[in-house]
């Protein structure tokens, strides 16, 4: 019996062995999906590989442009200011007769008095800023991320006070008696707005200027005799270019900024994007001739891409204030740091900094009696783009809920600068005596020439043949 069982088992094994080649012959080789998709497991054609690497470099440059625009926006303002007025913690330019179209800067507000300066904590160490009372202001880092509001929404509650701004790497003692904040960047943007008084039928800037000139800035540890006296140059009536670069200097200025600031100022993933186009802190930036072409293409195309998004609007409609009207909010429902409910809205952030600067919690808060709102429109009531060749009437209803003031301003759609019309200040506000209609409403007119019967304070001049946006 044992011998018979062994023979049967051996025969069965031979039979199975005989079946294996047949089963294997019926199976087809399985290639992975990516192998099928990319050249059947072989390297790319060298020309295709070069082309794809160039395309990736270009796409990364576009992404870098959009991501770093908030910083370049601030750098443009700083460089234009310091070229005109000089730099230093003690230099605080004030637009004492209000800002007009001769100052090229994104969406300036001609209806308050602007004070703007650029502090360097790496050079000067911790700085103390004595802020005036009743200022509408903020300190931001150079990505225009709010360090703190100043004024009614800030810790001083419109009483003014001493703010202590610490560098990002500061580890020393922190004295009491200050509103103390630490900046993520060595460079800090100081932006104060002071409110004008109502004069004889028009705004009176003098009290606002006087208040702004009570600002003081000095190093925390400086000996009093070594503190530089404050300088308040007048920015009004001067032609000043404070716009961000539109050519290859965008990249050289970005590289200088990356080198100057601490590593922690920029998150690692963004640094990775910058590294992929050759911008690495502490290393030479030497793009090849081909990369120079791609960088130039990116700095030309990226702003068009941002503008295309602004022009076409959002599929989710979050940019609209009302479903039945054309007014938009430039934050599109996001926080002042561009956070939607579950993501960072990088496209909306880029759209904002193409035409504006200075985003703060006070601008997006929904608290009655506090903060500010900036609804704008690029279209008329029928949905057509506003054109400077046409005549438009904006009706402001009676009882506008503005505690301090309301204002209406026209801007260029491309970069938010003021239209270069004969009327240097394309703005009006509630400080003017503007005739009211029988129902208490006010009519503001936009046109290349003033319509008959319209008072000067109710007219905003536009540039024929050019689109514009109107902000309330």
Task: Describe these PLM feature segments.
Residues 20-25:
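Sec/Tat signal peptide C-region and signal peptidase I cleavage site
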Residues 26-472:
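A compositional/structural signature for long, glycine/proline-rich flexible linkers
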Residues 2-3, 17, 53-56:
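Residues at the start of alpha-helices and the adjacent loop-to-helix junctions
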Residues 1-10:
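Bacterial N-terminal signal peptides that target proteins for export
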Residues 9-18:
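Bacterial N-terminal signal peptides
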């Amino acid at each position: 019996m044992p011998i018979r069982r062994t023979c049967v088992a051996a025969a069965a094994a031979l039979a199975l062995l005989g079946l294996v080649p047949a089963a294997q012959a019926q199976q087809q080789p399985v290639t992975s999906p990516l192998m099928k998709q990319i050249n059947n497991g072989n390297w790319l054609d060298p020309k295709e590989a070069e082309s794809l690497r160039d395309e990736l470099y270009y796409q990364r440059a576009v992404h870098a442009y959009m991501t770093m625009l908030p910083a370049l926006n601030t750098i443009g303002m700083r460089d234009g200011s310091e070229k005109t007025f000089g730099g230093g913690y003690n230099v605080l330019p004030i637009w004492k007769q209000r800002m007009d179209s001769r100052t090229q800067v994104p969406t300036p507000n001609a209806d308050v008095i602007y004070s703007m300066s650029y502090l360097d904590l790496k050079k000067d160490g911790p700085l103390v800023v004595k802020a005036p009372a009743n200022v509408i202001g903020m300190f931001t880092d150079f990505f225009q991320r709010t360090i703190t509001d100043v004024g009614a929404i800030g810790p001083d509650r419109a009483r003014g006070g001493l703010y202590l701004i610490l560098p990002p790497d500061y580890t020393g003692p922190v004295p009491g008696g200050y509103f103390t904040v630490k900046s993520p960047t060595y460079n800090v943007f100081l932006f104060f707005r002071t409110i004008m008084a109502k004069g004889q039928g028009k705004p009176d800037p003098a009290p606002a200027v006087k208040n702004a000139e009570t600002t003081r800035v000095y190093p925390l540890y400086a000996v009093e005799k070594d503190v530089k006296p404050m300088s308040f140059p007048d920015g009004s009536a001067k032609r000043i270019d404070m716009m961000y670069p539109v050519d290859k200097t965008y990249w050289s200025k970005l590289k200088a900024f990356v080198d100057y600031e601490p590593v922690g100022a920029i998150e690692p993933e963004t640094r990775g994007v910058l590294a992929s186009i050759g911008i690495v802190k502490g290393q030479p930036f030497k793009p090849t001739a081909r990369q120079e072409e791609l960088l130039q293409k990116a700095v030309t195309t990226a702003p068009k891409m941002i503008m295309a998004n602004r022009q076409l609007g959002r599929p989710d409609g979050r940019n609209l204030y009302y479903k039945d009207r054309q007014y938009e909010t430039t934050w599109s429902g996001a926080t002042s740091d561009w956070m939607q409910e579950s993501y960072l809205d990088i496209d909306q952030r880029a759209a904002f900094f193409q035409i504006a600067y200075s985003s703060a919690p006070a601008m997006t808060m929904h608290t009655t009696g506090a903060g500010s709102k900036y609804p704008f429109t690029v279209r008329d009531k029928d949905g057509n783009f506003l054109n400077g060749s046409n005549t438009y009437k904006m009706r402001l209803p009676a009882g506008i809920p503005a505690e301090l003031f309301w204002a209406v301003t026209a801007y260029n759609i491309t970069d938010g600068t003021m239209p270069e019309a004969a009327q240097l200040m394309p703005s009006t506000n509630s400080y003017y005596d503007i005739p009211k209609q029988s129902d208490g409403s006010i009519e503001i007119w936009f046109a290349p020439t003033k319509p008959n019967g319209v008072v000067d304070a109710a007219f905003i001049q536009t540039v024929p043949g050019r689109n514009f946006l109107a902000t309330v």
